[in-house]
């Protein structure tokens, strides 16, 4: 995601910095922004402002050695490796605010990482709260921190809880994959095409009947 105000990628860092218990349980890994880009473009300038805020938070909360800041990845293989890393370390993936959601769900499901998601701007039926992930609001840090702490505490007390949430993502694979989406789209396209063809066949007869109706009831 872009490291700008809208995506709120500095939010997880601020949440973790304010909540000591969360820092004990997990280190944030932030994948955002183009670290090597310099531009006077308005959008790029805003992203540079995001970097300044991120570095400021890292200094303020003394995160050096406890955070990983990685440039946004265009390489799908490398993205898959990042998701796999989350899975291998029994971590949680937090969806950026206003970020395209369904594709991330599919990718995350492939490696079975437990997933948190931002609540107000995504369809709630994709992630069932407490079943296949957690509903969080990225703009309410105190509440989010408590949700994440509770999740990791449960995982530490019962390691099978992480697997339970992860396995809950099976419903995503059953209902929201691109394969299912494309199959449904093709089915609906075929149905529409047939309906359109039949409608054209009936159009002449309908006009003929309408003519007699107009003559009888002027």
Curated annotation (Swiss-Prot):
The record's annotation in InterPro entries points to: Sucrose_synthase_pln/cyn (IPR012820)
Per the UniProt record, the source organism is: Saccharum officinarum (Sugarcane)
Instruction: State whether keyword Glycosyltransferase applies.
Output: yes
Single GO biological process annotation from the record: sucrose metabolic process
Q: What is this protein called?
A: Sucrose synthase
Gene3D superfamilies per the record?
Glycogen Phosphorylase B (3.40.50.2000)
Which reaction does this enzyme catalyse, per its entry?
Answer: an NDP-alpha-D-glucose + D-fructose = a ribonucleoside 5'-diphosphate + sucrose + H(+)
Q: Which SUPFAM superfamilies match?
A: UDP-Glycosyltransferase/glycogen phosphorylase (SSF53756)
Known role: Sucrose-cleaving enzyme that provides UDP-glucose and fructose for various metabolic pathways.
Tell me, what is one Gene Ontology molecular-function annotation carried by this entry? sucrose synthase activity
The UniProt family comment states: Belongs to the glycosyltransferase 1 family. Plant sucrose synthase subfamily.
Q: Which UniProt keywords apply?
A: Glycosyltransferase, Transferase
Q: What is its EC number?
A: 2.4.1.13
């Amino acid at each position: 995601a872009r490291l700008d105000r809208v995506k709120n990628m500095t939010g997880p860092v601020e949440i973790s910095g304010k909540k000591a218990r969360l820092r004990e349980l997990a280190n944030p890994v932030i994948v955002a922004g183009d670290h090597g880009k310099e531009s006077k473009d308005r959008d790029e300038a805003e992203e540079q402002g995001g970097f300044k805020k991120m570095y400021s938070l890292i200094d303020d909360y003394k995160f050096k050695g406890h955070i990983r800041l990685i440039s946004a990845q265009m390489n799908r293989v490398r993205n898959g490796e990042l998701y796999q890393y989350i899975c291998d370390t029994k971590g949680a993936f937090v969806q950026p605010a206003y970020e395209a959601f369904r594709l991330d769900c599919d990718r995350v499901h492939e490696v079975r990482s437990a997933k948190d998601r931002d609540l107000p701007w995504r369809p709630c039926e994709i992630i069932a709260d407490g079943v296949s992930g957690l509903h969080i609001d990225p703009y309410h840090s105190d509440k989010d921190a408590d949700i994440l702490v509770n999740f990791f505490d449960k995982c530490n007390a019962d390691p099978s809880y992480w697997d339970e949430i992860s396995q809950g993502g099976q419903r995503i694979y059953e209902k929201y994959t691109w394969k299912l989406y494309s199959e449904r789209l093709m089915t609906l396209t075929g149905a529409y095409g047939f309906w359109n063809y039949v409608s054209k066949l009936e159009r002449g007869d309908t006009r003929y009947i309408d003519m007699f109706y107009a003559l009888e009831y002027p």
